[in-house]
Amino acid sequence: KKMEPMPNRTIHQNWYEPPVLGPDENGLWNIDFHGGDLKGIEETIKYLKSLCVTIIYLSPIVRSQSTHRYDAADYEEVDPYAGTNEGLKSLCDAAHRNGMKVILDGVFNHTGNDSKYFNEYGTFDTLGAYQSTESPYYNFYKRIWNQGKRDFSFWWGMKNLPECDGNSPEWRNYILGEGGIIDQWFALGIDGLRLDVADELTDSFIEGINQAVKRNK
């Protein structure tokens, strides 16, 4: 399918075009896309079955700014470059018809700074945690003392990955609560989760994930 560029993201028509941003003195920005989507995976189901594949594990597919998508911008929406929520359901249905299960990568330790939750650059029409303490997402994030003032905590110091607070009732309800993100993903047909940086999630948050999964399976 034809993919329409989103702000600050680039679609390449062939593998030989150089990346738009970098590498330079600031490194390489992961915003260059070369295609590939959920529909393409669905179209290969019969081939995968012939290889005796029984599980399809997908790295993050939610809307994000980067190619790796470990910087979630919106957990409720499949990244338009990967497809749609309906496309995910279609893939899961096709997998199940062919004796396969689908596992998603759950990235719940942090979001992206360019997200509807943090919204550092004002990309989204939401009041982000970066913008105001009045944001409905403000309590999603960890805060620490930094040089005598209260600041957000970032995963391994990476300023594009603000850390979420696993003890925050608001964050827990959004991800773990009834009708929350995990429920929404399972409603689309997924069979399980792989947890990113699980060692950095709180025990109680992991237990909450376990309960949410059992509620759906």
What do these predicted regions represent?
Residues K217:
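P-loop/Walker A phosphate-binding loop and immediately adjacent motor/lid segment at beta-alpha junctions
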